[in-house]
Amino acid sequence: MSNSDNTTFATRILDWYQIHGRKTLPWQQDKTPYRVWVSEIMLQQTQVATVIPYYQRFMARFPDVQALAQAPIDEVLHHWTGLGYYARARNLHKAAQQI
């Protein structure tokens, strides 16, 4: 693809998103890198409709990376209960502690 083809393609994708894209998901409101990061981890192998209530509860308890890093792993896992793939929660917690 030429640069002009790439630009045209990118413009078409962005135009489509403006018309059809979801813009009201919880992680799209008051967007921060932390909120997007948590949502992306939760959304791995899990449907959006399933993630939303878990995400909201998780954010209420762990509103920022510091709160997540300082929490005991058992509490993080408790808030993850029902989402499955618990390695995601353990790795998220470890990463928060590294940050």
Swiss-Prot record:
Listed GO MF terms: 4 iron, 4 sulfur cluster binding; 8-oxo-7,8-dihydroguanine DNA N-glycosylase activity; adenine/guanine mispair binding; metal ion binding; oxidized purine DNA binding; purine-specific mismatch base pair DNA N-glycosylase activity
Domain of life: Bacteria
Class of the enzyme per the UniProt entry, highest EC level: hydrolase
EC number: 3.2.2.31
GO BP, sorted A to Z: base-excision repair; mismatch repair
Active site feature: E40
Transmembrane residue ranges: none
Keyword Cell cycle among UniProt keywords: no
Keywords: 4Fe-4S, DNA damage, DNA repair, Glycosidase, Hydrolase, Iron, Iron-sulfur, Metal-binding
InterPro entries cross-referenced by the UniProt entry: DNA_glycosylase (IPR011257), HhH-GPD_domain (IPR003265), MIG/MutY (IPR044298)
Cofactor annotation comment: Binds 1 [4Fe-4S] cluster. The cluster does not appear to play a role in catalysis, but is probably involved in the proper positioning of the enzyme along the DNA strand.
Reported cofactor(s): [4Fe-4S] cluster
Gene3D superfamilies linked to this entry: Hypothetical protein, domain 2
Catalysed conversion reaction: Hydrolyzes free adenine bases from 7,8-dihydro-8-oxoguanine:adenine mismatched double-stranded DNA, leaving an apurinic site
Pfam families on file: HhH-GPD (PF00730)
The protein's role, per its UniProt record: Adenine glycosylase active on G-A mispairs. MutY also corrects error-prone DNA synthesis past GO lesions which are due to the oxidatively damaged form of guanine: 7,8-dihydro-8-oxoguanine (8-oxo-dGTP).
Family, as annotated: Belongs to the Nth/MutY family.
Subunit structure: Monomer.
Name this polypeptide is given: Adenine DNA glycosylase
Species, as recorded: Aeromonas hydrophila
UniProt gene name: mutY
